[in-house]
């Protein structure tokens, strides 16, 4: 009997120890992820009871917080909501967070590691914690132009500062109003969410970062760079037939314009965007060299972690016909 009691006691002790280890591990190592989990009701209630930081374009807030007499002390408000929705995302009590509202949540709630001093100061002074603001790289005029240009159309516009990679504009159409998801009223928010999800035009999808499209002739820059890295020169002569039957197929590759002869320089082929010339150059280089150059340009990588993004791609195991099409930004390049 004593042996059985000792065995049960040992088992109970081990189970208690395992529980303590799990709780300690959760507290020490999973604190950040638990605090940032939008499904954590305790943290979520605390967030909605404090003054969240602004998201700024220049000095102008595009997402801010106002006092509220509703369920919580503060209400999230979006200015020009649909125009900036692909950047700010939404901040919803019932449906979580997206885009900058998600990736910069720690800064916006004042819980980031860099804000430890302000938290201590606030505690000592008895003030409630407040979130910190974030300033985007968006240029207001560029964003206006992008948004206005997309009116009535389906698509996306992104403008970059090529010297730094800074995003100057990011617009997606059709869009949505994040104010509808920021409401504290469950019925209103649920109705808005269901309508957005059911909309066949997918307004919740950020076409600038979450959708991938064939790059088309812009990819010829990648093929040209691969050529220059592998023995070609700007004045190298390349074949540029008016029509070219793709290897192993009956499919012709044609040109949108007259390339200027059956053989032209690589520089001229790029200048006039000659399809057959770059298709042939791509096949002569081989898919490994084209793919390597594409990866140097960022293909296969998520290039912007501040908003939810998907990686671009250059396909594998290509036939020569597929490689020719890929070398001009078609086939499965996206």
Regions found by a protein language model. Give the residues of each.
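Extracytoplasmic/periplasmic proteins that interact with beta-lactams or build/remodel peptidoglycan
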Residues: 1-156, 171-212
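Beta-lactam-recognizing serine transpeptidase/beta-lactamase-like catalytic domain environment
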Residues: 168-217, 222-334
């Amino acid at each position: 009997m004593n042996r059985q009691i000792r065995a049960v006691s040992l088992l109970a002790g081990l189970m208690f120890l395992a529980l303590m280890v799990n709780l300690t591990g959760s507290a020490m190592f999973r604190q950040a992820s638990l605090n940032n989990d939008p499904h954590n009701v305790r943290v979520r209630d605390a967030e909605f009871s404090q003054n969240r930081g602004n998201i700024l374009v220049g000095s102008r807030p595009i997402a801010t917080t106002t006092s509220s007499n509703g369920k919580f002390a503060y209400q999230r408000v979006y200015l020009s909501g649909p125009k900036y929705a692909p950047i700010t995302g939404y901040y919803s009590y019932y449906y979580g967070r997206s885009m900058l509202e998600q990736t910069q949540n720690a800064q916006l709630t004042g819980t980031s590691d860099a804000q430890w001093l302000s938290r201590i100061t606030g505690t000592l002074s008895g003030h409630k914690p407040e979130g910190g603001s974030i300033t985007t790289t968006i240029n207001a005029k560029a964003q206006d132009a992008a948004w206005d240009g997309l009116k009535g159309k389906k698509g996306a516009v992104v403008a970059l500062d090529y010297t730094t990679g800074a995003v100057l504009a990011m617009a997606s159409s059709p869009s949505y109003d994040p104010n509808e998801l920021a409401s504290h009223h469950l019925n209103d928010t649920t109705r808005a969410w269901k309508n957005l999800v059911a909309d066949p035009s997918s307004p919740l999808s950020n076409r600038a970062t979450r959708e991938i499209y064939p790059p088309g002739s812009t990819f010829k820059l990648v093929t040209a760079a691969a050529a220059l890295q592998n023995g070609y020169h700007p004045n190298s002569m390349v074949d540029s037939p008016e029509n070219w039957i793709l290897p192993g197929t009956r499919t012709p590759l044609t040109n949108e314009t007259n390339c200027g002869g059956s053989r032209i320089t690589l520089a001229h082929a790029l200048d006039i965007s000659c399809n057959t010339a770059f298709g042939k150059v791509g096949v002569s280089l081989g898919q490994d060299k084209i793919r390597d150059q594409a990866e140097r340009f960022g293909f296969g990588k998520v290039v912007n972690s501040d908003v939810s993004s998907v990686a671009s791609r250059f396909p594998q195991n290509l036939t020569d016909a597929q490689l020719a099409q890929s070398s001009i930004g078609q086939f499965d390049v996206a």
